[in-house]
């Protein structure tokens, strides 16, 4: 199994159990999240407590719907960015990320990040923002949005900000 860690924070953000599609010349990875239900399992043992004189047990059996990627990697939702704060974040992120990338990868990232940033800016009002479990300020952000008519959220990652780890 392959796990993808954030190069800047070390947080696990993705794994190869989620297939991705490359966007913006490979600078962004697009991954579809799925809603899953968590909660107690409904077990019917065939007994009828009211017919047997027993009382109905009051159990908190509320099921919760979560997005699999958010739950699996314990992603933390962040407040939304306005355009000014988003551009400021991207500039800081480019600086921090290119400092740790190999020169060839840094050049590749710099060439493609402008198109990726424009793509993200075009969806800014629809995006949700997530960071890894450590919630570090300079960490990579996973961006999520719903495509037209979709019930599952689509996540976007900067591919150059992920480090592949074999488990």
Curated annotation (Swiss-Prot):
PANTHER family xref list: TRANSLATIONALLY CONTROLLED TUMOR PROTEIN-RELATED (PTHR11991), TRANSLATIONALLY-CONTROLLED TUMOR PROTEIN (PTHR11991:SF0)
UniProt domain TCTP: residue ranges: 1-167
Protein name: Translationally-controlled tumor protein homolog
The protein's role, per its UniProt record: Involved in calcium binding and microtubule stabilization.
InterPro entries the record matches: Mss4-like_sf (IPR011057), Mss4/transl-control_tumour (IPR011323), TCTP (IPR034737), Translation_control_tumour_CS (IPR018103), Translational_control_tumour_p (IPR018105)
Similarity remark: Belongs to the TCTP family.
Superkingdom of the source species: Eukaryota
Protein keywords: Calcium, Cytoplasm
Gene Ontology cellular component terms for the protein in this record: cytoplasm
The keyword Transmembrane appears for this protein: no
Record bears the keyword Magnesium: no
Spans through the membrane: none
Localization (cell): Cytoplasm
Signal peptide: none
GO molecular function, one term: calcium ion binding
């Amino acid at each position: 199994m392959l796990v993808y860690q954030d190069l800047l924070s070390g947080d696990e953000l993705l794994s190869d159990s989620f297939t991705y599609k490359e966007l913006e010349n490979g600078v962004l990875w697009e991954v579809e999240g799925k809603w899953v239900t968590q909660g107690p399992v409904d077990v019917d043992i065939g007994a009828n407590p009211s017919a047997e004189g027993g009382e109905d047990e009051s159990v908190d059996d509320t099921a919760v719907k979560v997005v699999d990627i958010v739950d699996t990697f314990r992603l933390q939702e962040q407040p939304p960015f306005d355009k000014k704060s988003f551009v400021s974040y991207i500039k800081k992120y480019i600086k921090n990320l290119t400092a740790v990338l190999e020169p060839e990868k840094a050049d590749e990232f710099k060439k493609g990040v402008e198109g990726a940033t424009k793509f993200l800016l075009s969806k800014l009002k629809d995006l949700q923002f997530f960071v890894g479990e450590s919630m570090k300020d300079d960490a990579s952000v996973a961006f999520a949005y719903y495509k037209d008519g979709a019930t599952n959220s689509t996540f976007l990652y900067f591919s150059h900000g992920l480090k592949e780890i074999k488990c």
